[in-house]
Amino acid sequence: MKLDQIHQIAVYARDLDEAISFYRDKLGARFLHKFDPPGLVFFDFSGVRVLLEKTGPKATLYFWVDDIDSAYEELRSKGIEFLHAPQLIHRDDSGVFGKPGEEEWMAFFSDPSGNVLALASRRLEDV
């Protein structure tokens, strides 16, 4: 397995409205959605999602994988320690980020310098 598709980049934002104005109005990013609380704003840059958050780390790099459980197990077999197993992050009932009814799953880990990285995947909600 090779992690070669950036799915999302998370960046700290001290003021969400100021961030919306800057990224949408000045940089031309497509605004996706604002969740406040908890203090999240999402944009799309040609297929790469950018998350601005008021209470997160300075930056997090998310890698898209087709099968998060397999990718998680493969990286664990290479000695990577995860902060937690894959977990449900968002149930997309309205289709804000993809098809309605899909779930977004993530598993977070760190690089040797302590930078936060994540695996990300979507799957249909189990019925």
Region annotations inferred by a language model:
Residues 2, 80-127:
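Vicinal oxygen chelate
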Residues 7, 38, 104-105:
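Short loop/turn microsegments at loop-to-beta-strand junctions
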Residues 28-34, 82-85:
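Short secondary-structure junctions
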Residues 19-24, 75, 114:
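Conserved active-site tyrosine of GNAT-family acetyltransferases
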Residues 1-17, 59-61, 120-127:
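N-terminal beta-strand motif that seeds the catalytic metal site of vicinal oxygen chelate
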Residues 69-74:
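Short amphipathic alpha-helices within nucleic acid-binding modules
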Residues 30-65, 116-121:
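Conserved short beta-strand elements that form part of the metal-binding/catalytic scaffold
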